[in-house]
From Swiss-Prot:
Its EC number is 4.2.1.1. The lineage of its organism: Eukaryota, Viridiplantae, Streptophyta, Embryophyta, Tracheophyta. It comes from Flaveria linearis (Narrowleaf yellowtops). Belongs to the beta-class carbonic anhydrase family. This is Carbonic anhydrase 1. One of its GO terms (cellular component) is cytoplasm.
């Protein structure tokens, strides 16, 4: 039959847990929390019998007792009582002294360790980021930045999501001056409309007519929150958001197609399909811009779609055949 021996030891006051309570003593150490350590050992006072072989089968000694901390709910023991209990327990069970010493050293080290994690400083982050850019890129490539000072002539216009994980310059290694980038929720392109979404319209017009980009590239990505919203928001009824629901419904045809073709599949799988179908809807919406259609007919502009999977580290690229041809006169 085994008995349980217990002793109380103080824990540092910075420990925070809902199950812990501060000591109610009024002494200078009243803010210290008490911990109860319990060890199980045999009640026999005789020393353990050495291992021996019986029928050529090894007999192993019982494992050494382990001190396990159990936080008391009341925390009534004072600092002095905890130390006295510890001393008494170690006198009675000297074999536990190394284990207790190691545990105390651990607690002491935790209490003495400085908090090395400095609070986040956004201004310092911006400053250090620019210094790194200037010293490693700007200063080391003067020819590029001298040329960019004269103007820009990017080959790509890129629509990408605002998601912080999918920066196209990072993912596709675009260099400064190489891509004219528009980022918004779920990388969507609304149809041509002079009364709304003028920010997107202005960007497309400027890129095609003034910058003379050669490619318009719409990039979707994995685990897109905007696409998940599109798949889960009700199609009808009042909105629960001021802007998001109205915006993502730009690609409502993609949702309808996915629901029709993948009905019964898991939502996550539907979202993956919708991430790609929404890209196709945006590519189709680009055809509603007259200057985009003109560029396609004249072979001065091309449209492509893509999907970046940052979970698996893959990238898909595709083009759509819109069947456009130059007008003919009869």
């Amino acid at each position: 039959m085994s008995t349980a021996s217990a002793f109380a030891i103080n824990a540092p006051s910075f420990v925070n847990a809902s199950s812990l309570k501060k000591s109610s003593t009024s002494s200078a150490r009243s803010g210290v929390l008490s911990a109860r350590f319990t060890c199980n050992s045999s009640s026999s006072s005789s020393s353990a019998t050495p291992p021996s072989l019986i029928r050529n089968e090894p007999v192993f000694a019982a494992p050494a007792p382990i001190i396990t901390p159990n936080w008391t709910e009341d925390g009534n023991e004072s600092y002095e009582e905890a130390i006295d209990a510890l001393k008494k327990m170690l006198i009675e069970k000297g074999e536990l002294e190394p284990v207790a010493a190691a545990r105390i050293d651990q607690i002491t080290a935790q209490a003495a360790a400085p908090d090395t994690k400095a609070p986040f400083d956004p201004v310092e982050r911006i400053k250090s980021g620019f210094v790194k850019f200037k010293t490693e890129k700007f200063v080391t490539n003067p020819a590029l930045y001298d040329e960019l000072a004269k103007g820009q002539s990017p080959k790509f216009m890129v629509f990408a999501c605002s998601d912080s994980r999918v920066c196209p310059s990072h993912v596709l290694d675009f260099q400064p001056g190489e891509a004219f980038v528009v980022r918004n929720v779920a990388n969507m392109v609304p149809p041509f409309d002079k009364t709304k979404y003028s920010g997107v319209g202005a960007a497309v017009e400027y890129a095609v007519l003034h910058l003379k980009v050669q490619e318009i590239f719409v990039i979707g990505h994995s685990r897109c929150g905007g696409i998940k919203g599109l798949m889960t928001f009700p199609d009808e009824g009042p909105h629960s958001t001021d802007f998001i629901e109205d915006w993502v419904k730009v690609c409502l045809p993609a949702k309808s197609k996915v629901v029709a073709e993948h009905n019964g599949t898991h939502l996550d799988d539907q979202c993956v399909q919708c991430e790609k179908e929404a890209v196709n809807v945006s590519l189709g919406n680009l055809l509603t811009y007259p200057f985009v259609r003109d560029g396609l007919r004249n072979n001065t502009l091309a449209l492509k779609g893509g999907h970046y999977d940052f979970v698996n580290g893959t990238f898909e690229l595709w083009a759509l055949d819109f069947g456009l041809s130059s007008p003919t006169s009869v």
